[in-house]
């Protein structure tokens, strides 16, 4: 097996709608590593009312971004508990100061970057419409309503969430690019950036899978044998 006995320290990056969540869950299903999502970690700490959770909530409540040092403390505190396993960081580091702070404590072996054209992401994210009363979700591409803009069951109008409106999506994608471009350049210079480009998650995944086979042991679950 190409995977060495050394524990893998990995990061996954990708814009909202790039399929990062799907790829991350497939990685943890097939390989012996722990997936650490900064968003999940944040919610968990806020729910438990930890010191860092309370601090983070004060920024969120004011509509502000959580400062780099708070996010770094949050991630490093959790990573301290994961000394015996390989891990995949998702959502952190998101800025250059976060990447540099992480670097002082851990040597990152590989950064998986999902490079999906913004136009494709925009189509994915803006295709979602919902029926507010029931929470029913329609996707114009994969699961469209029988009549455009109308709920199948009630005949009531569908709405588009603020987050899914084209102008909001474009703003989010531009903000992501501005924030993460320096991080990608930083890891590129270190020689650990692996970029996987494509328009479909199912076509990108086999390349990510082959790459990780050389880096980390696969899970020995029987499920991988069954079709």
UniProtKB/Swiss-Prot annotation:
Coiled coil region boundaries: none
Which keywords annotate this record?
Acetylation, GTP-binding, Kinase, Mitochondrion, Nucleotide-binding, Phosphoprotein, Transferase
Q: Which residues are the signal sequence here?
A: none
| Reaction equation(s) it catalyzes | a ribonucleoside 5'-triphosphate + AMP = a ribonucleoside 5'-diphosphate + ADP; GTP + AMP = GDP + ADP; ITP + AMP = IDP + ADP
Keyword set includes Magnesium? no
> What's the subunit arrangement here?
Monomer.
- The protein's name: GTP:AMP phosphotransferase AK3, mitochondrial
The record lists the organism as: Mus musculus (Mouse)
